UniProtKB/Swiss-Prot annotation:
Keywords: Amino-acid biosynthesis, ATP-binding, Cytoplasm, Glycosyltransferase, Histidine biosynthesis, Magnesium, Metal-binding, Nucleotide-binding, Transferase. GO terms for cellular component: cytoplasm. Its EC number is 2.4.2.17. One of its GO terms (molecular function) is magnesium ion binding. One of its GO terms (biological process) is L-histidine biosynthetic process. This is ATP phosphoribosyltransferase. Pfam families: HisG (PF01634). Catalyzes the condensation of ATP and 5-phosphoribose 1-diphosphate to form N'-(5'-phosphoribosyl)-ATP (PR-ATP). Has a crucial role in the pathway because the rate of histidine biosynthesis seems to be controlled primarily by regulation of HisG enzymatic activity. It is found in: Cytoplasm. PROSITE patterns: ATP_P_PHORIBOSYLTR. It catalyses: 1-(5-phospho-beta-D-ribosyl)-ATP + diphosphate = 5-phospho-alpha-D-ribose 1-diphosphate + ATP. Belongs to the ATP phosphoribosyltransferase family. Long subfamily. It comes from Rhodopseudomonas palustris (strain BisB5).
Length: 325
């Protein structure tokens, strides 16, 4: 029996909801035949795909081991848990949810500390005065070490955080923190501020491929089908379909529309009867419609696109190139 193609997605909360919605929009609805509490699922029409519901950190670990082919997880977890992440996994595409920044945050009372260079001065002075290093509370040990080294900050020690990291300075278990934030509101509520150059990583949920997975011919074909769906939906979301027909429609008019409105003519120029189909960025719809009517069109129709299937699939090409390395 051929081994299944394993797609790992988050097992709870908003990340699970957003991941399921993302795949559903691409025509890849995930389902749990065993019920809502089942940790295994399927994709209709792709019988060889097994959906594994795991925590975000478990997904990163399984991608590193190659025990799943695709996974949905944050870049922050990949960079933290996989030392040579760019060699072992491929971030195929950002999914537009799960946004969070990994940041260096210090007490707001440190009014003279605004940059990593300021922090270097403060940590050096702190060690000279107290004969110990400043403590940094964080779950992101590897990211912190790398970022601090890049800024030549050495007089610190990491206190691994198991709970609410932002509370560490207030309770006296650390002087500063490295943590994730979306709006900064929680940090501010705890009397902390992000350094001006203290954003270590701008993360979001990604569709990720594992180099060490079993990439049989069947697995590659399954990946191509999945990525074809995703790419088709992504193309469709960028445009509205505009259709019209009038005698004055010609190649010169089309060239001007391309230049002014950023349209794409997926089926070529106007037909002999003046029929024209264009794909237009949504923000340019009214301008394009006015332009076409000014040049002789009586009617211009606009429709939403569900999918735009193209011969070339940049997502699969990216995966194929990664697996050849």
């Amino acid at each position: 029996m051929t081994a299944p193609f394993v797609l790992a997605v988050p097992s709870k909360g908003r990340l699970q909801e957003n991941a399921e919605a993302f795949f559903a929009r691409a025509g890849l609805a995930l389902s749990k035949p065993g019920g809502a509490r089942d940790y295994r699922g399927t994709i209709a029409g792709l019988d060889n795909v097994e959906v594994a519901y795991l925590s975000a950190s478990e997904i990163a670990a399984n991608l590193a081991r190659g025990s799943v082919h695709f996974g949905v997880t944050g870049e922050d977890l990949l960079r933290e848990s996989i030392a040579d992440a760019d060699q072992r996994v491929l971030m195929i595409d950002g999914l537009g949810f799960g946004y969070a920044n990994v940041v260096v945050a210090v007490p707001q009372a440190w009014i003279d500390v605004r940059t990593m260079a300021d922090l270097d001065d403060v940590t050096t002075g702190f060690r000279a005065q107290h004969n110990r290093r400043m403590r940094v509370a964080t779950k992101y040990i590897n990211l912190t070490r790398g970022f601090f080294a890049a800024h030549n900050v050495v007089d610190y020690r990491i206190v691994e955080s198991a709970g609410a990291t932002e509370g560490a300075p207030a309770v006296g278990t650390a002087e500063m923190i490295v943590d994730i934030t979306t709006t900064g509101a929680t940090l501010a509520a705890n009397g902390l501020k992000v350094l001006d150059d203290g954003v270590m990583l701008r993360s979001q949920a990604n569709l990720v491929a594992a180099r060490d997975a079993d990439w049989s011919d069947e697995a590659r074909e399954t990946a191509r089908v999945i990525l074809d769906h995703i790419a088709a939906r992504a193309r469709a979301s960028k445009y509205k379909e505009v259709r019209t027909r009038f005698k004055g429609c010609n190649d010169a008019l089309l060239a001007e529309a391309h230049k002014r409105f950023g349209v794409v003519s997926p089926f070529g120029g106007p037909t002999s009867s003046g029929m024209l189909t264009l794909h237009c960025p949504p923000a340019q719809i009214y301008g394009l419609g006015s332009f076409l009517r000014d040049h002789g069109a009586d009617t211009v129709s606009v429709a939403s696109l569900d999918y735009v299937l193209d011969k070339d699939n940049p997502l699969f090409s990216k995966l194929a190139a990664f697996l050849r390395q």
